[in-house]
Amino acid sequence: MLARRLIPCLDVRDGRVVKGVRFRDHEDVGDIVDLARRYAREGADELVFYDIAASARGRTVEPEWVSAVARELDIPFCVAGGIRSVDDARARLFAGADKISVNTPALEDPTIIDRLAAEFGSQCVVLGVDSRMIEGAWRVHQYTGDPDKSFAGHRRTLDWIGEGVDRGAGEVVLNCMDQDGVRDGYDIAQLEAARAMCSTPLIASGGAGRKEHFKSVFELAKVDGALAASVFHKGVIEIGQLKSWLDGEGIRVRP
């Protein structure tokens, strides 16, 4: 396996970075470009930006702030939010994004994955999966950026990951909703199950609270990267220090 990636996640709403707990009660944490610049300086391997309200509001992530971020960064970044067509994706890639992530739009029309992969290559296409245990099974949720519209669909999480990869997704980000923002560790069981059947790079999301949580998810779930938000936003963990610690623990990370 290649060196593991550490990826700050920036949830965007109304032009600002916000953070909630279990996808609820979001608070403002800062300016998009300022935080992007800070994380690049601290040693982040890449960044992920989710416009969390875009799908629920029937719009698409704004290319203006994508361009503003691109002008400041020399590391890769991925954007998501209401991307429903090849033209939507092309505009965001031309604005400077390196990858496009699809979540709710892909659940509504799975062929968007095929079309994006055919047009831009699988390396540009990320499948975002928001998952929670419902009646003994992990199920995919839609419109998770809006509490009034969010719901669990009929798809089981592992089945959907398999379908997304078969359709051409080159990477999967598994957002474990019950772990989101609570800082008590990643959902190792769910991530292990996903790892067992996912042949593409798998990124863990939801639950980081201590540096030991990163070590555990890399060692036990064998994920390729770990997404985190609140611990980075609030300075609980500094990325450069985390990399040094992980390296000392035998986890291969990027310089």
UniProtKB/Swiss-Prot annotation:
It catalyses: 5-[(5-phospho-1-deoxy-D-ribulos-1-ylimino)methylamino]-1-(5-phospho-beta-D-ribosyl)imidazole-4-carboxamide + L-glutamine = D-erythro-1-(imidazol-4-yl)glycerol 3-phosphate + 5-amino-1-(5-phospho-beta-D-ribosyl)imidazole-4-carboxamide + L-glutamate + H(+). Its main location: cytoplasm. Keywords: Amino-acid biosynthesis, Cytoplasm, Histidine biosynthesis, Lyase. NCBIfam families: hisF. GO terms for molecular function: imidazoleglycerol-phosphate synthase activity; lyase activity. The active site is at residues 11, 130. IGPS catalyzes the conversion of PRFAR and glutamine to IGP, AICAR and glutamate. The HisF subunit catalyzes the cyclization activity that produces IGP and AICAR from PRFAR using the ammonia provided by the HisH subunit. The lineage of its organism: Bacteria, Pseudomonadati, Pseudomonadota, Alphaproteobacteria, Maricaulales. One of its GO terms (cellular component) is cytoplasm. InterPro entries: Aldolase_TIM, His_biosynth, HisF, IGPS_HisA/HisF, RibuloseP-bd_barrel. Belongs to the HisA/HisF family. PANTHER family: IMIDAZOLE GLYCEROL PHOSPHATE SYNTHASE HISHF, IMIDAZOLE GLYCEROL PHOSPHATE SYNTHASE SUBUNIT HISF/H IGP SYNTHASE SUBUNIT HISF/H. It is found in: Cytoplasm. Pfam families: His_biosynth. This is Imidazole glycerol phosphate synthase subunit HisF. The keyword Iron does not apply. GO terms for biological process: L-histidine biosynthetic process. Pathway: Amino-acid biosynthesis; L-histidine biosynthesis; L-histidine from 5-phospho-alpha-D-ribose 1-diphosphate: step 5/9. Heterodimer of HisH and HisF. Its EC number is 4.3.2.10.
